[in-house]
């Protein structure tokens, strides 16, 4: 048996092998040691025929599902090896085969599968010209997609990340460096498949795919699925081709910064835009909503179609509420179809399918009555599958058991033979009850009873006290107990045979009838999948209508002009979280000839919220939802770029400033005049003058070369003078007022630049020490009153022994003030200088390497460089200094 195990294990080295032995799945050797640790189960051992014992652990077969889910949830694979012949009739070792390989990307059900999220398996194929093809499959729904990608490896990885896949399939020669990024950066399970030809029998799924590259990626994906699942895949849907330029592009960093589907802090749905908009009533509607949010539209006509449909639902309360009530009764048709194809559907699943289908005719009829071309096109070709509803209605019991092997699944009247067996079983038991009464009357023994157990079958039981009353020769002794004797008669044995045969045949026949019924349902899978898409889309549209009415959103107007007009706009999620507290709305009005808003104002005043607000309004508009405003006119944006908040962890090993520059580069390189750019305090990760210079250069480049609608917030108040030289830039600020020495943030956007930053007031709100606040105010007053370097005030620090107060020599002050510095390093203001800063230094301020770098900096002509060239030069010089 161990030899058999090792032979099977050789083909599944990267998976736990669940090896069926009787009522247990056993694991041996390294699998056992690792599984015992991961599953927290007992590790034992068995004799292996040598001096060392074989490590071993096992789980009961009826509880295996839970243990398999635990392992897969941790990123492992599990190969399930079953006994494929009856041990009673087997000659020698029972024949065993792996019947399924369960992986993170091929899980069909379990707690790891969120009902409102897809579980995609990805396959990535790299070509010699540098391009990639990415194919994805959700085995639970049968959905298949494929796209062609170009760009850097990081761009490809981010697109893979956007699919939400937990497992990715590549060929065995795939770059090890890229694999490391997949495992370390994206935490994905890696699998291998070299076959790329479309498997026999699945050619019809790629009829609309003509590009050889795309077919190779799909072929790799399908071959892996077939190899791991080893069963029917009748529910796989035709492959959908998508191109990234068909949708608004939002890179993963921006999606995370905007918290579209999950929050930055908790990585959970609650608190995201998806959380707010999700009023769907079906699981499949929830999945479609998330897909829409991942890929907003850029076709004006399609967006307007959705908006008109949402408006119809908003204006017709009774239609919307009636639709919602019916949708509540619709189960997950996509995943039910998948279970039918996989052969793991049970009677309760089919009952759910029937209950869902009962709602469909009324839903389709209500939508057909609407005077709306989009609605008519949506339901065109949708089949309510009434014949399937009728079939399930007359075949499946109303309260069937979970197991399909326990009987009591099929209704009376569905099958004549089954009805006959049930009649024999039912009447046989009635006959036994009558026999018991008759025997009591004949013998006069009132305590006589007829019973049944699995070992002895039916019997007549008489207590020992009443044995003398039994007629001679009437009964045949069968079993002796302490206080009773059990007997049988020829008549009872005959009936027992009929009853037991009938009950055994009932269970087997019901199982056979159910499996045949399942095959009949398979025929309807394509119709069920089409129906699922129709119902999902209606569900998302009613969800938009429901949230729009509840939150008082308005239908926007899409314009072909490059103008933004938002009156009383709100951040939808912040407003919801405030839960009735006063939210301050803000306008965002950018005419066609106005491209850049330079936003100033104190921290905590709402600059970032205002910027995110515009982005979320834009996303909502382009998925077809009403928006949080009293009036809105928007163009269709092709891309959104954001740099808001702290550094992302997707690109590891880079400083905050470097990540900031890389994201700025991404926007500058890819944005068009139809894009939206949101930059929050660009340049803050380096020194003041470097940051200010870069911020100004970036603003000028966007203004002069790109022309994208841009919100650029900054604490560099010196930049506000750009309004005088850049005719399509406008200063705006978030207002605040001082009352009794305290700052009050009004959260209102107003024209013009901010007059103060109120940073010290924010520090007061954070409850920094009073002495520190007082010192900060003193330094601020000095800074605002002069341009020369401030000599830090000496603060006496008490330790074990009071240190003498440092003496500042007048000649030293004069020397410092007379020194005219041009470099960034020497012009930085020192607020907290130590004793050494008041003394003459014995060694030069700059070493030889630093002097050389300084000389290079002096020669740089920033006005003759592009922002990207400036960033590259800065990065090069910084690396040169760090090497020392």
UniProtKB/Swiss-Prot annotation:
One of its GO terms (biological process) is mismatch repair. Keywords: ATP-binding, DNA damage, DNA repair, DNA-binding, Nucleotide-binding. It comes from Bacillus cereus (strain ATCC 14579 / DSM 31 / CCUG 7414 / JCM 2152 / NBRC 15305 / NCIMB 9373 / NCTC 2599 / NRRL B-3711). ATP binds at residues 601-608. It comes from the Bacteria. Belongs to the DNA mismatch repair MutS family. InterPro entries: DNA_mismatch_repair_MutS, DNA_mismatch_repair_MutS-lik_N, DNA_mismatch_repair_MutS/MSH, DNA_mismatch_repair_MutS_C, DNA_mismatch_repair_MutS_clamp, DNA_mismatch_repair_MutS_core, DNA_mismatch_repair_MutS_N, DNA_mismatch_repair_MutS_sf. The keyword Transport does not apply. This protein is involved in the repair of mismatches in DNA. It is possible that it carries out the mismatch recognition step. This protein has a weak ATPase activity. GO terms for molecular function: ATP binding; ATP-dependent DNA damage sensor activity; damaged DNA binding; mismatched DNA binding. CDD domains: ABC_MutS1. One of its GO terms (cellular component) is cytosol. This is DNA mismatch repair protein MutS. Residues 826-845 are annotated as: Disordered.
